[in-house]
Amino acid sequence: MAVGIFDSGLGGLTVLDAAQKRLPDVDFLYYGDNSHAPYGVRDAEDIYELTHKAVHDMWDRGCNLVILACNTASAAALRRMQEAGVPEGKRVLGVFVPLIEALTERQWGDNSPPREVAVKHVALFATPATVASRAFQRELAFRAIGVDVEAQACGGVVDAIEEGDMILAEALVKSHVDALLRKMPRPEAAILGCTHYPLMEDVFQKALGPDVQVFSQGRLVADSLAHYLERRPEMIGGGNAGYVTTGNANRVSSRATQFLRREITFEAA
């Protein structure tokens, strides 16, 4: 019984990598919708339909739990999928849940009124679609008061990373950080609201300065998943992993191997 990790492209591999290191005995299935990537420039309805199709495919492949390791999909599709009803014995969770738990210092199921939190000025770096959805701001507002969030849509960064052009990606990150700092000169914390961005975490940190706490998703999601699985020992397996893609399997395998710096072999979905 594998845990499913879904992303529109390769960014979710940062979440998978952290989860495998944290949970070496859990089986994982990674599903990349590479033929439709990137999601960040698509409209909300398109993102929902693509995500809905992929998640149902993963459930059919035996994944009782699917993590949307794509902030754009989480922002546009997660709540709608959950409200529409999930088949018995299946679950779908969003990747930004652990981020908001960490930022607000409260569990997702805590339904007490919003309260003051330590961090007051937060920079959010995400894809254009995630920024447009205002999902981070909405979920934060349910749990915290007095938090000022300044969002920066980071156009081009995902494309550069997917193409392996890290020089361009670094230049774009610096440009987007500069644009954010013109709007919010002194953020206390920064959310890397895309699973591709941990690969550029050092660039974000350097551009923001040492006094800004950077929240990156891989470790937080892995810790949250470990806590979830403590209550579900039946999901412990042999530590195997499978990789499927809607794109060109050979090309995606090559990119993924570069991405994680270890051999990754995808099969066609």
Swiss-Prot record:
Q: Where is the active site?
A: C70, C194
Any one Pfam family here would be Asp_Glu_race
Which annotated residues bind substrate? Answer: D7, S8, Y39, G40, N71, T72, T195, H196
Q: Which PROSITE patterns match?
A: ASP_GLU_RACEMASE_1
Q: An example of a Gene Ontology BP annotation on this entry?
A: regulation of cell shape
What EC number(s) would the UniProt record show?
5.1.1.3
Domain of life assignment = Bacteria
- SUPFAM superfamilies, alphabetized: Aspartate/glutamate racemase
Q: Which UniProt keywords apply?
A: Cell shape, Cell wall biogenesis/degradation, Isomerase, Peptidoglycan synthesis
* Reactions catalysed according to its record: L-glutamate = D-glutamate
Identify the metabolic or biological route this protein is part of. Cell wall biogenesis; peptidoglycan biosynthesis
Classification via Gene3D superfamilies: 3.40.50.1860
InterPro entries named in the record? Asp/Glu/hydantoin_racemase, Asp/Glu_race, Asp/Glu_racemase_AS_1, Glu_race
Q: Which GO terms describe its molecular function?
A: glutamate racemase activity
Q: Which family does it belong to?
A: Belongs to the aspartate/glutamate racemases family.
**In UniProt terms, what function does this protein have?**
Provides the (R)-glutamate required for cell wall biosynthesis.
Q: Could you tell me which HAMAP family the record lists for this protein?
A: Glu_racemase (MF_00258)
- Protein name as catalogued: Glutamate racemase
What is the organism field in this record?
Answer: Ruegeria sp. (strain TM1040) (Silicibacter sp.)
